[in-house]
Amino acid sequence: MEELLKAIVEHQASDAFVTVGAPITLKVDGTLTTLGDQPLDEKQVADLIAATMSEGSQQAFAERQEANYAIDHPDHGRMRASAFIQRGLPGLVLRRISGEIPDFKALGLPPVMKQLAMLKRGLVILVGGTGTGKSTSLASMLDYRNANSRGHIITVEDPIEFVHSHKGCLVTQREVGLDTESYDVALANTLRQAPDVIMIGEVRTAKTMESALAFAETGHLCFCTLHANNANQALDRIQSFFPAAQQNQVWMDLSLNLRAMVAQQLLPARSGKGRVPVVEVLLATALIQDHIRKGEVHLIKELMGRSTEQGMQTFDQALLEAYKSGLISQADAIRHADSANDVRLNIKLHEHGAESLTESTDFEVE
């Protein structure tokens, strides 16, 4: 285990994959590379997994054939681990977690996210697929809040990724499976712990989504993450959590309590070193709230594109700006676009000295 953790840190890998019949594989800047060419056998993989686990994680893995946990090593830092069984054989994926919480400037995040971190109340959802950096961005937002305000921040995570020290705020971090039985059990008791800010590691069910909305409705600021590719998909996914009879009420609750959605992807840097965050920002202006209340999700992206002066931007606009700034290649900008044709056209307009036009819509962070 020591050698594996050391290799992850030395190569600055984001992930490590351990599976029977293949060499240990690292993901570095989004590209897979193997450590040697010697495939691992079943015993080697099983022994490696056991070496990373606490007694409780070993018991959970034996009972459920799945285990998610964190590794906290004094020399090699923190790792998020997911052990599983595939085709009857053990497997493990490790994700490296930076020891220090990066700030907004280091991450290249839009300035409006500082305003979102300091909101008094409401719901802020960070959206993205696995490995897109949304947990890191959320940790940066919480750290900014922690350093620039006073209050009580409670996080419920599975597992805890970034460890927050007490700065201006008191920070309580609870890990599912270690400090609490489940998200739902922890969230049912959270309001009794007098929080000002609540962070839910991931929304996976209707019940967890209801808790997030309830926290916002009762005057708290709630952050959470959700697996989706963009803001529109995230809204559709929230709708899919609930039966048809509840969906109108869900749209109403979202329209009243949602303050922002931030969707993120990580693209290869044009320099060949590292990756670049590309961020879509949806802010709850009066018009956005009206569309959400009516369930008119299909109208939201166009409005986002016309509201850039207020801090909103679509993925395609963010891709174009990253390309114009020399951060990503033209090929990657087009490949990752929601509308490749629109991005291709705007790149041509830029190269010919023209700019795409935007209209503004009033928005003020409360």
Predicted regions and their residues:
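Short, flexible helix-loop junctions that flank or precede catalytic/ligand sites
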Residues: 1-366
